[in-house]
Amino acid sequence: IKRFAFEHYGAHVVLSSATSGWNTNTITLPHSIPALMYVGPGYCDLVLNPTNVLKGFTGRDARPWIKGVMVHELAHCLDVSRDMPSFTGRSIGTRSLAPGEAIKTATLEKHLEAGSRLPTQIWREALADSFAVGFWRMTEPAADQLVADLQTKRAGGDAAHSTNCWIEQAAKAPLPGSMPELLPWADAIREAAICTL
């Protein structure tokens, strides 16, 4: 993932300990997340717990699934980093925020608040899932099965991961011509799909 991120997107990825991620629902649970990407000042920090990533995975080969999870997390970092002043040297952007939340955002604090609300969580997951689906379709012979597995996982998941509408669009959209074009391709799917936030 480090080489892939740098070669295609100029992003630096740091790999952190699988036990450094915390899930925060109603209580804070250490080591409970499957994967998480923090956005650091100029880099992406990936936490990946392979045991948790593979919970519920029923396919024969786990490697493409794990690659897809890592690429999904990279998409989160690429998405949010475009909005951050430390990455862009300009004012705060709103591309990673749900359209209804973006119009209310003028400060970094408001941006961070909007990022924690459900519409923006779904908006961000839609991009990351579309990005992963495109990656699988461009690289994996068993992409159709991986996409079906992702749809099954999302159908039984939490509200923030209700992205099957976008996954369906990504599964049938004409693919980009190269990996560097994958992020704008996923952006276009997220923006054009008639899906509910």
Protein language model annotation of sequence segments:
Residues 1-19:
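Zn2+-dependent metallopeptidase catalytic core
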Residues 6, 75-83, 132-141:
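Sec-exported extracytoplasmic/periplasmic mature domains
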Residues 25-64, 70, 74-81:
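Active-site scaffold of zinc-dependent metalloenzymes
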Residues 80-125:
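Post-HEXXH active-site segment of zinc metalloproteases
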Residues 6, 38-41, 159:
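Extracellular/periplasmic catalytic domains that process cell-envelope and extracellular macromolecules
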Residues 64-72, 122-133:
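A structural signal for well-ordered alpha-helical segments within the folded catalytic domains
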Residues 111-121, 130-197:
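Long, well-structured alpha-helical subdomains associated
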Residues 15-25, 88-99, 151-155:
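Acidic helix-start/capping segments at beta-turn-to-alpha-helix junctions
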